[in-house]
């Protein structure tokens, strides 16, 4: 993979345009979760240290394209960066026809989705963005799976297009986990639906030594094994698909283990009473919300012996503590394991935070959809663009 890296370039006196993923939650004009902003700081600081005039752009939320909407303004991000960078940071609303930026200054462009043509990767818009810079830096792994004007088109037309340290680090870590993994390799795929993760399950099942399913996905596999799932969330039309995945895994000497014990309740609520049952004892009125302690220990043992662990999705409704023990045990096992571990996806990162294991995970991926598409083996448009420009 030949991709230029920003850290290897001479940026002295250069106009550097960085595409970050600064799509953070904002409430009453204040950023409420700054994880993505913190992740972007080293790249912005490095560009400043290298003597660049720095421009930063991102989307924020889902405004109607082509229309200004104060609710989705980048102003709260600018306020945050002003404090975090300890240097002048200004917001620019009108920049497409040219903007003056001084060396040592940071200018944040207003929400890129206020520009008509952003999502469609409009060539005229991309060329205007490209004309603003000497070097374009793609550093937003979270949007690398989208071919849009600010993530893809601009890079085709900029004088130089390179990856930022955050994106480069992400690709390196994911490559290490998927291209040449330390064995045995274990993938834990949770979440509510098999249908949304089917291609991920198929792709991973051919790469890993052990595939583990959790959450609503596991319920479909429980049903596929011939057990009742009561009123649990599951997909009856994908039972044959689940059986095929299990058969494929077994034909390669692996398996997709089904929980032996589960935690059930009669309703989905934070006050629901949790009851532990053997998987064969689930009644018609039960809803499965977590794996039981025996199943959790069996998975912890698999993780303990792994060389590589990829974690995408919780194994239970961990938002409610009485259904969080399974996910908590998985998190602890990953934290205690010597394996190279990667965690990605919004719910997974919330679990990593809740159980305080962030510093024990080898790599935490900033991408949601991009992380999944990488696991599926799909080519990410922004990465393909950087490769074509790196030749």
Swiss-Prot record:
Catalytic activity: (2R)-3-phosphoglycerate + ATP = (2R)-3-phospho-glyceroyl phosphate + ADP
Superkingdom to which the source organism belongs: Bacteria
GO cellular component: cytosol
SUPFAM superfamilies cross-referenced by the UniProt entry: Phosphoglycerate kinase (SSF53748)
Any one GO molecular function term: phosphoglycerate kinase activity
Annotated residues for binding of substrate: 21-23, 36, 59-62, 113, 146
Main location: cytoplasm
Record's subcellular location: Cytoplasm
Pathway: Carbohydrate degradation; glycolysis; pyruvate from D-glyceraldehyde 3-phosphate: step 2/5
InterPro entries: Phosphoglycerate_kinase (IPR001576), Phosphoglycerate_kinase_CS (IPR015911), Phosphoglycerate_kinase_N (IPR015824), Phosphoglycerate_kinase_sf (IPR036043)
EC number(s) recorded for this UniProt protein: 2.7.2.3
Keyword Nucleotide-binding set for record: yes
Keywords: ATP-binding, Cytoplasm, Glycolysis, Kinase, Nucleotide-binding, Transferase
Residues holding ATP: 197, 319, 345-348
PROSITE patterns: PGLYCERATE_KINASE (PS00111)
A GO BP annotation: glycolytic process
Quaternary structure note: Monomer.
HAMAP family: Phosphoglyc_kinase
Protein family according to the UniProt entry: Belongs to the phosphoglycerate kinase family.
Name the UniProt record assigns to this protein: Phosphoglycerate kinase
Organism for this UniProt entry: Shewanella pealeana (strain ATCC 700345 / ANG-SQ1)
Gene symbol of the encoding locus: pgk
């Amino acid at each position: 993979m030949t991709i230029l890296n920003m850290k290897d370039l001479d940026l002295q006196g250069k106009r550097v345009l960085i595409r970050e993923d600064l799509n953070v939650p904002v409430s009453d004009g204040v950023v409420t979760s700054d994880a993505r902003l913190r992740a972007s700081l080293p790249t912005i600081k490095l560009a400043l240290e290298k003597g660049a005039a720095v421009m930063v752009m991102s989307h924020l939320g889902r405004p109607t394209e082509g229309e200004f909407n104060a609710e989705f303004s980048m102003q709260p991000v600018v306020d945050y960066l002003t404090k975090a960078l300890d240097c002048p940071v200004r917001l620019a609303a009108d920049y497409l026809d040219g903007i003056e930026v001084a060396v040592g200054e940071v200018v944040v462009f207003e929400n890129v989705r206020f520009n008509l043509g952003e999502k469609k990767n409009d060539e005229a818009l991309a060329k205007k963005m490209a004309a603003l810079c000497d070097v374009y830096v793609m550093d937003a792994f979270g949007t690398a799976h989208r071919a849009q004007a600010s993530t893809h088109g601009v890079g085709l037309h900029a004088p130089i297009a390179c990856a930022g340290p955050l994106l480069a680090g992400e690709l390196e870590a994911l490559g290490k986990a998927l291209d040449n993994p330390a064995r045995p390799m274990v993938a834990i795929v949770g979440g509510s639906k098999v249908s949304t993760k089917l291609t991920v399950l198929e792709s991973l099942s051919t790469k890993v030594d052990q595939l583990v399913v959790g959450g609503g996905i596991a319920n479909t596999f429980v049903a596929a094994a011939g057990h009742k799932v009561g009123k649990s969330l599951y997909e009856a039309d994908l039972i044959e698909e689940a059986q095929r995945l299990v058969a494929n895994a077994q034909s390669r000497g692996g398996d997709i283990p089904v929980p032996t014990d589960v935690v059930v309740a009669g309703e989905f609520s934070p006050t629901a009473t949790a009851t532990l049952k053997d998987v064969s004892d689930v009644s018609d009125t039960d809803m499965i919300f977590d794996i039981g302690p025996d199943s959790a220990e069996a998975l912890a043992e698999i993780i303990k012996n792994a060389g590589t662990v990829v974690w995408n999705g919780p194994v239970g409704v961990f938002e409610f503590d009485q259904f969080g023990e399974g996910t908590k045990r998985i998190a602890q096992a990953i934290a205690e394991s010597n394996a190279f571990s990667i965690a990605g996806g919004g719910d997974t990162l919330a679990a990593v935070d809740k159980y305080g294991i962030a510093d024990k995970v080898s790599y935490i991926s900033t991408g949601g959809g991009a992380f999944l598409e990488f696991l599926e083996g799909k080519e990410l448009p922004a990465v393909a663009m950087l490769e074509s420009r790196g030749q």
